[in-house]
Amino acid sequence: MTTRYIFVTGGVVSSLGKGIAAASLAAILEARGLNVTIMKLDPYINVDPGTMSPTQHGEVFVTEDGAETDLDLGHYERFIRTKMNRRNNFTTGRIYEEVLRKERRGDYLGATIQVIPHITNAIKEKVLAGGEGHDVAIVEIGGTVGDIESLPFLESIRQLGVELGRDRTLFMHLTLVPFLGAAGEVKTKPTQHSVKELRSIGIAPDVLVCRGDRAIPANEKAKISLFCNVEERAVISLKDVDSIYKIPALLRSQGLDDLVVKRFGLECREADLSEWENVIYQEANPNGEVVIGMVGKYIELPDAYKSVNEALKHAGLKNRVSVTIKYIDSQTVEAKGEEVLQGLDGILVPGGFGERGVEGKILAAKFARENNLPYFGICLGMQVALIEFARNVAGMADAHSTEFNKETPFPVVGLITEWIDEEGNVEQRHEASDLGGTMRLGAQLCHLLEGSKAAQAYKGNSCVERHRHRYEVNNKYRERLEQAGMIFSGLSSDRKLVEMIELKDHPWFVAGQFHPEFTSTPRDGHPLFEGFIAAASAHQKRDLK
């Protein structure tokens, strides 16, 4: 199979939405029957984002094969059916690490290792490998043109443009076309300078996607075309919209997919965007609203919980309600108590690391349990629910996780020292293991208890979900917790690790050690999130009676 490559760059400012634009184009091409994948090349020196602060970088998206990747891969999976893997995201740090490892082994036969050709060759190899088996591979280059960190990646795609030729490569550049209120017009000069910068390193863009708060007038499109040496039909206006799921239709209406298909000489059907039209209709026509309190520690940057935010919205679509997320700092819960948890239709406690704010999350779980409020715990959210139950129901005062208190008399949550990975291999860890790349990661089979809310949600006796954690329920206390009324509704493939818990005599109190948000999509939703929002809606109706 001959793969075509679309390289996506950004200029003028960061955070223009390259990932959304790339994913939206991929969605249109997929709707035309093409097999599409997307890659993200990140210019930072970290090997992967696994140890980066969520408040700096946003969430870490975990793929099926256990790669810790950029949050843009979450956008990719939500827009197209292709599942991402570790080949879809790599960083400068990972490239340098692999090249230096080869140098130490003597693979370069004593050559002087340089950015060109050794680093650029390594980048090109990964891009080509990632695109294998697909009709089209869209490659997003992180950062902004002009950044020193991005230069090796830009040089690599320049070389690929020459080596593969125009019939197999296309360069798409996102820029900002701001509107100046004082002048009453949009300004194209930033775009002109950005394209000039890109051309100075040997890349001439074939398509310009111009971001702005409004549509770009035809005369300004013509001006951009003239000064940037791009066909006028290839100047695409991408205005702000109230839903990212409207962007595929917006790009389709301007013929971007036709331009790509013609450039590559591909024969395929017209795009069928009916699924996306249905998503947009559901989003615009809710029958009600629920308020979900998300009790976390990284709430100053909502992108730290990007997939959770989107999964809640997807569940709202399936339940025909809009979901309003109220972000609650877990430290505020510690300081002010239950008053900050009033007026909610449900509580969700997402994953997290470190001791800061953990007691606030425990209080949130207690509030939901005692007030029959729907509760959904994810990863740490499951652990704090179990700790709260152990302390206040099972009679284990001062129960805790050894992550936060190594001297606790009841270590109901402890470090996983051994487990079976997705390929059936035995993995082992200990306290001195590195932080990076040492967690239980990736898709794992989970056996569900017959008759449980989990089994009802999944409509079966098993599920496969993605993990990212070091700590698990301590099996020593399972029997005591069960006797107190806790239900262990999900177990690992070897049935040795607890994956899900529920509570008896509660409308909806469900928590999982895994991260179901990573597999939720706007078209398909996710059974656990759908069940949670349905329970929140039912709770609201009971309160109104």
Curated annotation (Swiss-Prot):
- Ranges where the Glutamine amidotransferase type-1 domain occurs: 291-542
Q: What's the EC number here?
A: 6.3.4.2
Which positions bind Mg(2+)?
A: 72, 140
InterPro entries attached here? Class_I_gatase-like, CTP_synthase, CTP_synthase_N, GATASE, GATase1_CTP_Synthase, P-loop_NTPase
Its annotated pathway reads:
Pyrimidine metabolism; CTP biosynthesis via de novo pathway; CTP from UDP: step 2/2
The protein's matches in Pfam families, at most eight in alphabetical order, are given as: CTP_synth_N, GATase
Residues reported to bind CTP: 14, 147-149, 187-192, 223
Quick one: where's region Amidoligase domain?
A: 1-266
Q: What class of enzyme is it?
A: ligase
> Where does this protein hold UTP?
14, 187-192, 223
Q: Which Gene Ontology BP terms does the record give?
A: 'de novo' CTP biosynthetic process; pyrimidine nucleobase biosynthetic process
Q: What are the protein's UniProt keywords? A: ATP-binding, Glutamine amidotransferase, Ligase, Magnesium, Metal-binding, Nucleotide-binding, Pyrimidine biosynthesis
Q: Which GO terms describe its molecular function?
A: ATP binding; CTP synthase activity; glutaminase activity; identical protein binding; metal ion binding
Which positions bind L-glutamine? Answer: 352, 380-383, 403, 470
Protein name as it appears in the record: CTP synthase
Annotated source species? Shewanella baltica (strain OS223)
Q: What is the lineage of its organism?
A: Bacteria, Pseudomonadati, Pseudomonadota, Gammaproteobacteria, Alteromonadales
